[in-house]
């Protein structure tokens, strides 16, 4: 990269000014199956006893689909916060308190180590008792509790279901859009769960939310440029978790994001003939954030 190119990048991607406004993205990513899913959910809502809304503890605001509030109407709802093992618990706890003050029950879970899963079953037992006590009063037979599981793509819905079932019931992968249709799954003799594809709102016109979703793989990487995502991650880490990123890549003095990228390139062996392989650097930054090598983080702040 010659000096002209570096100056151009510096002009476009200054990271010294943390208040710099992000490029307006106005992302339109609303595949046909998402609109279809919303219609099908509305059709089946009367069958549902409780809604499990799944969000990512690292982005507890950005990963919450605001359209779900309208979709589920007055149904009983539990907010299940996954990836609690990867978040900055001090700041995520503020979000837990925020949602609980709005009257929403929150259950933070670690799906890797299966922590707090019993709390989910405790809730379903309470719903089961309430449901079937009422049915008995009306002279009706007992029936299974029916749960609707909702959330944006790639927040851990499939992993959660497999954990509840105790075996592999759904496909799991670290990319959005794996589940493509509604499917009833039997959890045990008392619980049935309706799994749904991840659904976003029609237009992501909030820059910070869009970048948070892209950073944590809730939207496909093709939607936002990897350079843009990587630079957003660097700027956010330098602002919120400076020690973590400095220690990870042995960063010393730097004047702008290009110098940070060059230092990271040297650290990971992505420099050849004095030229940094920026695509490799971007890829490593995204990987390090998503796999926890940059430490425990929460990008949404109250």
Residue ranges of predicted features:
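Anionic group-transfer/hydrolysis microenvironments
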Residues: 55-58, 84, 99, 164, ...
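Structural beta-sheet core signal
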Residues: 53, 79-81, 149
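Glycine-rich phosphate-binding P-loop
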Residues: 146-166, 170-171, 196
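Conserved active-site beta-strand-loop modules that form the wall/rim of enzyme catalytic pockets
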Residues: 111, 161, 191-194
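Helix-rich effector regions associated with P-loop NTPase G domains
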Residues: 1-50, 58-59, 64-66, 73-76, ...
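Canonical P-loop GTPase G-domain recognition
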Residues: 85-151, 169, 270, 280
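Long, charged, alpha-helical interaction scaffolds
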Residues: 53, 115-116, 147, 161, ...
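Active-site cofactor/substrate anionic-group-binding motifs, chiefly glycine-
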Residues: 75-85
């Amino acid at each position: 990269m010659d000096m002209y190119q570096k100056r151009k990048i510096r002009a476009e991607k200054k990271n010294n000014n943390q208040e710099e406004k992000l490029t307006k993205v106005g992302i339109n990513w609303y595949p046909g199956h998402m609109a279809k899913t919303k219609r099908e959910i509305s059709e089946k809502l009367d069958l549902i006893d409780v809604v499990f809304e799944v969000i990512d503890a690292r982005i507890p605001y950005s990963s919450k689909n605001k359209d779900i509030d309208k979709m589920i109407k007055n149904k009983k709802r539990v907010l299940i916060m996954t990836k609690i093992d990867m978040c900055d618990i001090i700041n995520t706890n503020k979000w837990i308190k925020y949602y609980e003050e709005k009257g929403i029950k929150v259950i933070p879970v670690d799906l890797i180590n299966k922590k707090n899963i019993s709390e989910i079953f405790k809730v379903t037992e309470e719903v089961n008792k309430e449901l079937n006590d009422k049915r008995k009063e009306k002279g009706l037979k007992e029936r299974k509790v029916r749960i609707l599981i909702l959330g944006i793509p790639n927040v851990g819905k499939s992993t959660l279901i497999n954990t509840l079932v105790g075996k592999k019931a759904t496909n799991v992968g670290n990319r959005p859009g794996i589940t493509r249709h509604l499917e009833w799954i039997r959890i045990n003799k008392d619980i049935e769960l309706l799994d749904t594809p991840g659904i976003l709102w029609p237009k992501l016109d909030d820059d910070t939310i869009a970048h948070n979703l892209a950073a944590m793989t809730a939207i496909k990487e093709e939607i936002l440029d990897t350079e843009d995502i990587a630079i957003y991650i660097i700027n956010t880490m330098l602002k919120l978790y400076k020690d973590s990123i400095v220690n990870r890549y042995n960063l010393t003095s730097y004047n702008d994001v290009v110098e940070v990228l060059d230092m990271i390139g040297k650290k990971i062996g992505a420099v050849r003939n004095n030229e940094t392989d920026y695509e490799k650097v971007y890829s490593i930054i995204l990987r390090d954030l998503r796999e926890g090598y940059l430490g425990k983080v929460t990008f949404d702040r109250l």
